[in-house]
């Protein structure tokens, strides 16, 4: 297993432990309590990741990617979507052309 997957698995487990936590003392609990805020933060991190990719170099991209993945995990948890559900969606798309997969989606 990749080091990234191991770290993400531990991080996802830690995020789950923050559900129901005190939002005044835990940033993660604050985001988990407010899915709209979690979504906003994910959007901000996505933009910062794109900027790092085109203008700031590999180290900045790695750092912003870490922030992006953290905020994505929080949003998924805040929305009560399991990582297995996401994995199922990805698995269903394996071996399908991206263009064919997009064309098959409902509008």
Swiss-Prot record:
Main subcellular location: cytoplasm
CC per GO annotation: cytoplasm
Entry EC number(s): 3.6.1.31
GO molecular function, one term: ATP binding
This protein's UniProt keywords: Amino-acid biosynthesis, ATP-binding, Cytoplasm, Histidine biosynthesis, Hydrolase, Nucleotide-binding
GO BP field: L-histidine biosynthetic process
Annotated compartments: Cytoplasm
Enzyme class: hydrolase
Reactions mediated catalytically: 1-(5-phospho-beta-D-ribosyl)-ATP + H2O = 1-(5-phospho-beta-D-ribosyl)-5'-AMP + diphosphate + H(+)
Recorded metabolic or biological pathway in which this protein acts: Amino-acid biosynthesis; L-histidine biosynthesis; L-histidine from 5-phospho-alpha-D-ribose 1-diphosphate: step 2/9
Superkingdom as given in the UniProt entry: Bacteria
Family from the record: Belongs to the PRA-PH family.
Name the record gives this protein: Phosphoribosyl-ATP pyrophosphatase
Source species: Caulobacter sp. (strain K31)
């Amino acid at each position: 297993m990749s080091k990234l997957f191991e770290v993400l698995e531990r991080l996802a487990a830690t995020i789950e432990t923050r559900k129901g936590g005190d939002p005044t003392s835990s940033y993660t609990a604050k985001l988990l309590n407010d899915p709209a805020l979690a979504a906003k933060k994910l959007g901000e991190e996505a933009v910062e990741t794109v900027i790092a990719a085109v203008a700031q170099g590999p180290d900045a991209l790695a750092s912003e990617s870490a922030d992006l993945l953290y905020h994505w995990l929080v949003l998924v948890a805040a929305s009560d979507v399991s990582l297995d559900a996401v994995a199922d969606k990805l698995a269903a798309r394996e071996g399908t052309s991206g263009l064919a997969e997009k064309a098959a989606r409902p509008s």
